[in-house]
């Protein structure tokens, strides 16, 4: 069984909803009623909290083993590949759905902050503040997930799904309207092809630069990450896959500039969907099929960049700033807040901007002391680089 839902990211209008394979077989609406673990499709909310807490898409976080003491014993989370990748830019963490980087981010930012984001967006009414929930172990509905992703797509403004746009009385007077934004010139005759100006008065739930940074990172999921083989559409698409433990539920939630849609598939009584089942492989094609048709009616375009964005070329493998105008497969143009542009080098979680002459890994005891430049422009003297197995200070873990 499964569920599907699509909505307009600006008005909240629900464009499509499917609650199961057959209403005759079951009238249970899995889009609105089934509470399931979202798995990795929850991770963008952890990254949103990190981006608003001083991280950038180029910040380096160490992907390495981690152990958490719990009342049930020691918890040792793993990446899906059962491998570790060392120092990695934040962008890659979400593109490749790295569990260990996400746990480390949640630990650094604080689960109270992450839970606050999830509750503000409406993913949960009350989220458990334990680290495992950063990987999507709390239950929610597809309806709530799609509505929450809509706020990424529209630049961070609150929007609620609706099945009713407006209600009129028998005289044609509007007595209820869902969209409360102000239309500046709706009563004025406009030239053909000219749209009225709509002024937003909605609550802002996320900084618009953060929303754009996150959207750009989630475009990478589709372009070269866990959804790359499933999504092939003529307009820019951002999204996130989700696969729970033992592939009992699989998800994909994604959006264009004007439509957000999500899919989850799983058994009503949870059991594995089979070896190799994944959100990208099962739900990705469902999303792609729907959006292929929807785009023909609703179109789509580039995601709007905020005026406060400062675009800088970054090496997507190392997170290092590159000279303007460089090109190549390793180059990605990142948005930075004004005044927070990175210096040349690699910005580590923990505050250091390490020049290209300082390797990420080096065998440790005999290394000479080095002077490095911190992210605020000042310098600091540090000892030799630790080995890969010993790297563990400065907030990296």
Language-model regions, residue ranges each:
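Active-site-adjacent helix/loop patches that line small-molecule binding or acyl-intermediate pockets
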Residues: 61-66, 70, 78-154, 162
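Soluble non-cytosolic domains of exported or imported proteins
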Residues: 22, 35-41, 55, 84-88, ...
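Periplasmic/cell-envelope proteins involved in peptidoglycan metabolism and beta-lactam response
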Residues: 1-36, 40-44, 48, 53-59, ...
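Active-site-proximal alpha-helical segments within enzyme catalytic domains
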Residues: 9-14, 44-52, 138-163, 209-218, ...
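Short, glycine/proline-biased beta-turn/loop segments that scaffold the active-site neighborhood
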Residues: 33-87, 159-181, 305
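Soluble, non-transmembrane domains of envelope/secretory-pathway proteins that act on or interact
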Residues: 59, 65, 69, 75, ...
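Structural recognition of the beta-strand scaffold that forms the well-ordered cores
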Residues: 3-6, 15-17, 59-60, 92, ...
């Amino acid at each position: 069984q499964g569920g599907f839902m699509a909505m307009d990211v600006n008005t909240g209008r629900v464009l499509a909803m499917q609650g199961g394979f057959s209403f005759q077989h079951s009238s249970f609406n899995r889009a609105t009623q089934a509470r399931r673990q979202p798995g990795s499709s929850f991770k963008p909310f952890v990254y949103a909290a990190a981006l608003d807490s001083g991280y950038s898409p180029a910040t380096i976080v160490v992907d390495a083993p981690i152990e958490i003491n719990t009342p049930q014993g020691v918890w040792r989370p793993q990446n899906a590949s059962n491998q570790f990748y060392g120092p990695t830019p934040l962008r890659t963490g979400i593109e490749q759905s790295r569990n260990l980087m996400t746990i480390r981010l949640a630990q650094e930012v604080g689960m109270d902050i992450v839970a606050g984001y999830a509750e503000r967006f409406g993913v949960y009414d009350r989220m458990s503040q334990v680290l495992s929930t950063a990987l999507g172990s709390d239950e929610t509905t597809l309806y709530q997930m799609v509505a929450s992703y809509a706020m990424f797509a529209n630049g961070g403004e609150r929007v609620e799904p609706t099945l009713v746009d407006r209600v009129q009385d028998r005289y044609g007077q509007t007595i209820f309207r869902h969209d409360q934004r102000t239309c500046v010139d709706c009563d004025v005759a406009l030239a053909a092809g000219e749209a009225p100006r709509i002024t937003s008065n909605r609550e802002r739930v996320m900084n618009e630069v953060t929303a754009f940074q996150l959207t750009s990172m989630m475009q990478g999921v589709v372009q070269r990450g866990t959804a790359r083989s499933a999504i092939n559409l003529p307009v820019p698409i951002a999204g996130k896959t989700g696969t729970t433990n033992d592939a009992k539920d699989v998800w994909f939630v994604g959006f264009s500039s004007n439509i957000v849609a999500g899919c989850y598939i799983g058994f009503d009584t949870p059991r594995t969907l089979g070896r190799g089942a994944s959100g990208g492989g099962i739900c990705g094609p469902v999303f792609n099929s729907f959006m292929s048709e929807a785009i023909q009616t609703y179109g789509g375009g580039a995601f709007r960049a905020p005026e406060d964005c400062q675009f800088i070329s970054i090496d997507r493998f190392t997170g290092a700033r590159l000279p303007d105008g460089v090109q190549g497969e390793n180059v990605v143009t990142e948005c930075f807040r004004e005044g927070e542009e990175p210096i040349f080098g690699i910005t580590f979680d923990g505050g250091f901007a390490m020049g290209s002459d300082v390797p990420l890994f080096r065998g440790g005891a005999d290394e000479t002391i080095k002077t490095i430049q911190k992210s605020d422009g000042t310098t600091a003297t540090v000892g030799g680089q630790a080995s890969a197995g010993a790297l563990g200070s400065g907030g990296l873990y």
